[in-house]
Amino acid sequence: MNTFSWIFLLALGVSLALKLWLARRQLQNVAANRGRVPDAFADSIQLEAHQKAADYTITNTLQGRLELVYNSLLLVGWTLGGGLQWLDSSWQQFGWGTIPTGVAMLVSAFLIMALLELPFSLYHTFVIEERFGFNKTTPATFIGDMAKQALLMLILGVPLAWAALWLMQESGHLWWLYLWLLWAGFSLLMLWAYPAVIAPLFNKFTLLDDENLQHRIQSLLDRCGFKSRGIYVMDGSRRSGHGNAYFTGMGQNKRIVFFDTLLKTLEADEIEAVLAHELGHFKRKHVQKRIVTMMLMSLAGLALLGWLIEQNWFYQGLGVQQPSNHLALLLFLMVSPVFTIFLQPLFSWFSRRHEFEADDYAATQASAADLIRALVKMYKENASTLTPDPLYSAFYDSHPPAPVRVAHLSTKTG
């Protein structure tokens, strides 16, 4: 161990302590408010539904707290515990050469990480979601999803890893810039291809066939100047009772998707209001802003890695004795979240700001009152807590807390 080892452990300890403290605040706040529905929701949400949401939030937070400790121990095991060094040495014995060995190392490491997360995924799906009446996933579907995800990782990940390691080896001291261009291109390609190629591997998508709703939606799209490949309904009920809607794709491949569970919950005017909110993200260019932000972050990260890769203390401080490009990449991907935790509340704040902007747009194109009714139904059906801890919410939540969001929309109903 060297000085950087202690810096890493200190940062990890501070990060873990902060997250555990926030989780404790969330648990205490939700439990303290479990016995009473907030006044703003007293007429629309019954105490039983409110208590279910509180219990669901508490259960998920408890599991999340356990995962925090588990993942921190795994990270120490992978790094200072010698896990990565051992796995790399195992692949080196085959004598395949630098790039093939690096690709095998990257792919196997990510597969092992996924397997180590499997117990939590199984427990969440088949115990927690089942207990609260949300789970519709069968063991066969769960296994099928895992197999598809693994196959996709191999089909997409192996060529990407090979190209990345080749650039790191062959393109000189500016390899990080070329790798960033590769990553940017790949990310944009995936964003474009996801709706039409990847998502249908996991869910069935059908065009909305309700003529009355189609007419209302098309009228809204025309008012907003939005052209898409269609309004789709996804068979979300095949896996879960949760409902949602989202905007996906880019260019000529833009789509708006409703979960079938959501369409069963909301009335036509409420669906129109939810769609107006999603269109607000499009009109306010939130997707483009997020893409640019992520691209700049990845550029800064790769530039930093371009310097770290030459520093022996970086490897030795994280339990690696034989430096290599693929180990530098793995170490950076695994450890950087520990040192960038301060960005989490900043990104959450920007995301909540975008949600407010989308709500404001929806209030001008549809009805704020309809959107409020839709949100209340979604909070109820998804068992979303109405009383999150303010600091926990500020740190993590991508959407404004329910009372704050509804209060904001209420100012737009006049």
Please report, for each region that a protein language model flagged, where it lies by residue:
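Polar-ligand-bearing catalytic/cofactor-coordination segments
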Residues: 2-322, 338-414
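Alpha-helical transmembrane segments
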Residues: 331-335
